Swiss-Prot record, chains A, B:
This is Histidine--tRNA ligase. It catalyses: tRNA(His) + L-histidine + ATP = L-histidyl-tRNA(His) + AMP + diphosphate + H(+). Belongs to the class-II aminoacyl-tRNA synthetase family. Keywords: Aminoacyl-tRNA synthetase, ATP-binding, Cytoplasm, Ligase, Nucleotide-binding, Protein biosynthesis. GO terms for biological process: histidyl-tRNA aminoacylation. It is found in: Cytoplasm.
């Protein structure tokens, strides 16, 4: 992590770091599959028309073009294309927009409600800052229905993510839940009709503080000081149970949409409070910048690392995907895997027990033993023990050093007894202990079989 | 597979198809790790300077640019860039060139010989044809040394790939091995100095036949009819053991480089013949188009699907990566995962036993049982059994249909006995068999636990 990326914003991990990332991805996948989510991948490129459909112009998009075509344009042999041509190709900047397209295209082949997970790289041409990569991996789950989708899924997906994050060596986290209808209904109830504008200002609350947001609300949305104060009073409400409902009612605002949002959020928070106590709160300051959310919205902070921003965000979208009159409402959450792994590595929250999968390094006493040593390794691998074979009969000290540099715990020796018969011994190079072993039945302790990724000691 | 890609050359799988691809990737990863290869990923983008360093101009490269910049250029507010600017970004078209850069950049942090696997998407802006995707996944293994690398690794990597491919439900395959030194030494020995030109012509042998290649050799490389005949006689040699050596000698050509190549190839083929009988042959027609190979080269055909082209190719490269005077010779092989999976799916060589991970669908008798049903599912998941819970107490027929459409084998029912106590039953919806079960200890048969991907019946 002290290494500098050779291209700013494009991070690459060393093998031991990649093991931490792989552990995160494997753990997430395992949890998602235990909950019945099917894995899919979508292509890395979308048309600009698709990507910008929901007005996501604030995302810095990477366009893609065939080099041969660019050269023909530069040479005057081809007409330049409009850079904003909706048919132009660009790299996806999240997995939700591509998933919505996938659902619409494949609706006839999918069973709804469709539960899917998707773990892929995405790209944004942003200015790189700490925690802002230009290439990063997201891990998403979504449930999408055909026509309608039970509100129970709003709690379900958050519970799955709570379980997934809880299985990672990252310590405490808190899922903060709000509801767009609640917020929009409240704003309308106090006479602010530009609800998107209010949300944009409220979204800046943690960054700039309440006074600045009050000023923004008055200057940019035309709120009165009283309206600004009420919007801020709403955003100040945060409870771990459904008591937020009373606190909202105490503000004395009424609106049909507000009622709907209160009911929905109370249902979600009650379920989370019961099934994942301490993992979630109702937090009415959560806005989520994205236009396509229509109900529940989520953000997640890593406790003690709040300035990192949200590590797992999402929401309910009732109209992101549609095909003629047919709509596919969905709800989902997305983990920023790269952001999380960068933090895990830079803070040494988790470490891999070695840098290679190998558990046993089979040493060579004589060069011509190589094939027999491969037989030993093959016997070990048959029982799931990763093994490598030396390629030449160097001094044992050098062969042990090969294992030591990689953190390989065991070195296997093939010798001869006084009668000239083959004898096998295995050495734990950490303790120096060495004893006779049979390649057909020796096994290492379970914790040495594969590289372990664990929370580092505090 | 009958679906048409919405962007030509960019394939996306349905969930059941993705399970086949995932099975391929999991199997490869497992084999690579058992052999001590460490997984890494490199960024999707490289600079054009890196990508085109080895003269790979025949690959159609996708350039990447920030849309915002393109728009400024179009509006005349920014100078257009040279499309061939070596600092320009582009998507990688293979994993070998990026890996070479990674090794050079991180040499101080890696232990050599460095064994790594890498499974990622790559992109080529080619005209899509059957089997030629514009976005596809490659699975590579390479071993790279610091200064020198034992020739034993040339056999080692081929054996690992033979084991990996042998673990896939794809039937027979054959790794065809040749050696650049052997071929180049032979061509020089018969007086043909433009060895790259000869290789380019020989590379077309399977496509256009020997007569056309003879014509090409004479027209494009300036060979005499006798020289062309000798080059073709070499390419005609194919043996499963080291007897190719005698057959080459019988052609009466001598050259120092030829001798070196014969020795190297004989060593590799002898090892493969002994340790993976029937999986590999010496095939002196194998040329490999890429410039960077310097010794052993490999291609692999799927028996009965030869027209698909090579599914696993690679070779030894002694000079791809260097840093000042320090060189990092390597040898590796790359599986064309997408090409292979497309064939597996289109020929129905393998099928997934269901389209979702879920083994048990917990039905609801009453809406208010949802949380208790989640407790049942949680108990199952604790034992590694993927489970989903219904969100509403629809008619049992509809709930069973939900499971049936997805291929979920078991439906769990929560009822009450006459005394009002909770009773659990589980139904195998394939046989209709239903019996009492305890959520704390019931387990499905091993073959129903997770989706199975198996070779389809012939």
């Amino acid at each position: 992590m002290s290494r500098k990326a050779s291209l700013s914003g494009f991070h690459e991990w060393l093998p031991a770091e990649r093991l931490v990332e792989q552990h995160v991805l494997d753990t997430l996948r395992r949890t998602f599959e235990l909950h019945g989510f099917a894995g899919i991948e979508t292509r890395a490129v979308e048309t600009l028309g698709q990507l910008l459909r929901k007005g996501e112009v604030d995302k810095e998009v990477y366009a893609v073009s065939r080099l041969a075509e660019d050269e023909e344009v530069a040479a005057g042999r081809r007409e330049p294309k409009d850079p904003a041509d909706p048919k132009r190709l660009a790299l996806h900047f999240d997995l939700t927009v591509p998933f919505a397209r996938y659902v619409v295209e494949n609706a006839g082949h999918l069973a709804f409600p469709f539960r899917r997970y998707q773990m892929q790289k995405v790209w944004r041409g942003e200015r790189p800052q700490e925690g802002r990569a230009r290439e990063f991996t997201q891990a998403d789950i979504d449930v999408v229905g055909d026509g309608a989708l039970s509100p129970r899924y709003d709690a379900d997906v958050a519970l799955v993510m709570a379980e997934a994050l809880g299985a990672l060596p990252i310590g405490d986290f808190l899922i903060r839940v709000n509801n767009r209808k609640l917020a929009e209904g409240f704003y309308r109830g106090i006479g602010l009709e530009d609800t998107a504008g209010v949300l944009r200002s409220i979204d800046k609350l943690e960054k700039v503080g309440p006074e600045e947001v009050a000023r923004l609300l008055q200057e940019e949305v035309g709120a009165s000081p009283e309206q600004a104060a009420q919007a801020l009073a709403l955003a100040d409400i945060r409870t771990s149970d459904t008591s937020f409902v009373e606190r909202v009612r105490a503000l004395g605002v009424t609106h049909e949409l507000l009622e709907e949002g209160l009911t929905e959020l109370a249902d979600v928070v009650a379920t989370l409070h019961r099934r994942a106590p301490g993992r979630a709160v109702a937090d009415l300051s959560i806005a989520r910048g994205l236009d396509y959310y229509t109900g529940t919205v989520y953000e997640t902070v890593l406790v003690g690392h709040e300035q990192l921003g949200s590590i797992c965000s999402g929401g309910r979208y009732d109209a992101l995907a549609s095909k003629g009159n047919r709509v596919f409402p969905g709800v989902g959450l997305s983990i920023g895997v790269t952001r999380l792994v960068m933090r895990m590595l830079s803070q040494q929250m988790a470490v891999a027990s070695r840098s290679v999968p190998t558990a046993v390094y089979v040493a060579l006493t004589a060069d011509e033993d190589w094939s027999e040593a491969q037989d030993v390794a093959a016997l070990l691998r048959e029982r799931g023990i990763p093994a490598e074979v030396a390629v030449s009969a160097e001094k044992f000290g050098r062969q042990i050093k090969y294992a030591d540099r990689r953190g390989i715990p065991f070195v296997w020796f093939m010798g001869r007894d006084d009668a000239g018969a083959r004898v096998h011994e295995v050495k734990d190079i950490r303790s120096g202990e060495q004893h006779a072993a049979d390649p057909a039945d020796w096994t290492p302790p379970a914790e040495d079989l594969l590289p372990q990724v664990a929370r580092a000691q505090d």
